[in-house]
């Protein structure tokens, strides 16, 4: 048992508010202890946690609960403890896994049985997207004439605009005239086009952007008024105030100034200068994945946007992604943030472009939950440092061509050297503040839709743009274009929210093909035409997406396993059914790793708006331009679609731990079984009601078996391991109208196949086969006719004065239940009596109360069956429509007859006749209308 004091402490900690929990986290002793995270099933009770602490007391020390994730708890273990020999990740990251170490088998098995997952928490350091050094800035010269008359005229207009805006809004900030990203005086039009929104008083009111960075100088005169302390925390020094402490802790403050620098007389002005900023400090020292996860959702009820200008090192060598618990935290952010509308995560694409780096090798920027922002300079050109990839959604302004972003700095200074994609991300975050201020009801996916649909394409001659399914242009360099604040905000004002998210996972596609280059092999002239390419594809059907409730594509991901002797020489792309190409892996000359890609996920936003239906092709190829030996083994891959749901009411909550490929297979199998069950039941009913002899029933059952054997699951077919198809293309893409039609179509197909397979048979054999098929075909037509007559009788009412009335003897008929064939006019007087005898109005058998001898009942049944069959045959083959006044069966008018009977019983005989005449005239008109409707349908 746990000591009472410890038990009280644990319960008190778990019940304390979130802020108090952060304040109660004890200091970490990484020198003497290892830390790990345990996931326990404590959703309904804290007993599993209490039991775990009690059981492992003396082995592991309880530290604290992870506030960002339910059911996750931090423990520590002394580095000298023997359990360190097998302790590792379990149901978590796919490295440093738990090992069933010799001598600790029982300890291993026991620990695994107690927990749902274990995550090791080693120290790590995240890298800032630091501004590119000025001496390394690429100065791009173009053919623009800075001294031309047109340019002078344009700049004169820009100066006049600047003066007017400053006067109207009373702007006196000394650096405002140098903030070209707000009003570009030298290259007019190459700015974020925000001043029109300012004049409309759209200034970011009510929106808070968290700078997940190295701190924010909340004491700066340019920041203080717009600083939000509730959304702030220092994870490096464990405190409420995220003030910069190190000499290079200026990054977050500069980013904050871009967004929300106050309109005053200090430095410049923020793009959303009435919004607020908070600081979440994580980049000023080593942290663990639990700290990072906490940071990504800290102040989730306060912060709307999380601006992140950091990630793996931008050196063209690193392949890195967030740990599983960080991914879980981001999923929590988009599911629970902003009152369930979802927090907005904005990431800088990276500054490794000059090293050949790509943002698809960065698991933060290629997350579907991130808006990845690249950079353009003040001329609108693509800087060399800005990383391009298929995950880039938009670009906005930053340093390049000798110019930088002018913003607030630490120590009461102003900065004129802020740049890189780390300056582009907060500028975009400020624009998203304006968007949310104008329309706070947008979800996280709506913000991405607005980015895709209202960004402005730029440098169309440079970016290898492709036209997408939405008739939008997409470039790996520029995404869907630059952020035009005025255009995007006004687009967002009238935006109607999309339906909730849905997703599709394919099966894992085994490839296991190898490419090997040799020194003697001649190198190709272009990267896009390598001598060897491994091809694979997956066919996504309409049925696949429908069963998973997916209407259209937003993001696609490709999870791969590729072994390589030189990772930087591997290239990969995916081609959609519409022909849009996403470059997933590009060559990186500095990446000489031999680890390849192990369960690595690439992402693309280039296919936004596609249906997803059709063949998705992947190509893996090698850079053999060096003339040395490189080997690539493409083992397997999995294709995933994330998009809008068909039916929002059926939308689910995404769980990263679930295997949605297995769920899809289960749903398809369940639907298949239900379809078989429905078809079998319908076929059996048809055989019973239309066949008087045993031979007819056998024929119908046989036809049903034929249909069952020809139907196949229309799930995704894997091109690399193709199987023989058992259905025609029409069966795959056209819905089945009825069982009878299916039987007929199947029989026709079987007939055609039989003719092809038996070309050498004699004429007698062919005649016999044709005769059998003709009989079955006629029977199918009869069944169709029978069903059509039933439907007509079910849904078309007839007048109450017809000749055919319900008989009073109470006998039952299988085909037309509850109908009266009597010509008597006094049937209304006996309606209540007949209703008392009948307690069901369903088609089929009734619960009759009369006792009739078996022989009498059988004779009556046979007679009625013969009469009914003759009538059906006459009606079906008639050249004119029946007289609905006299010959139409009457279903569903019992209540009307009952009411008429009650009125007739109360009224005098003479008035009864008048009423009957009037009613008959009304019903004659109704019958004429019904007659017209039937003629139209026929």
From Swiss-Prot:
Keywords recorded for this protein, A-Z: Calcium, Disulfide bond, Glycoprotein, Golgi apparatus, Hydrolase, Membrane, Protease, Serine protease, Signal, Transmembrane, Transmembrane helix, Zymogen
Q: What class of enzyme is it?
A: hydrolase
List where Polar residues composition bias occurs. Answer: 711-735, 902-919
Annotated compartments: Golgi apparatus, trans-Golgi network membrane
Mod. after translation: O-glycosylated.
Membrane topology, record value: Single-pass type I membrane protein
UniProt lists compositionally biased (Low complexity) regions at: 677-691, 850-859
Name of the protein: Kexin
Q: Could you tell me which species this protein originates from?
A: Candida albicans (strain WO-1)
Q: Which gene encodes it?
A: KEX2
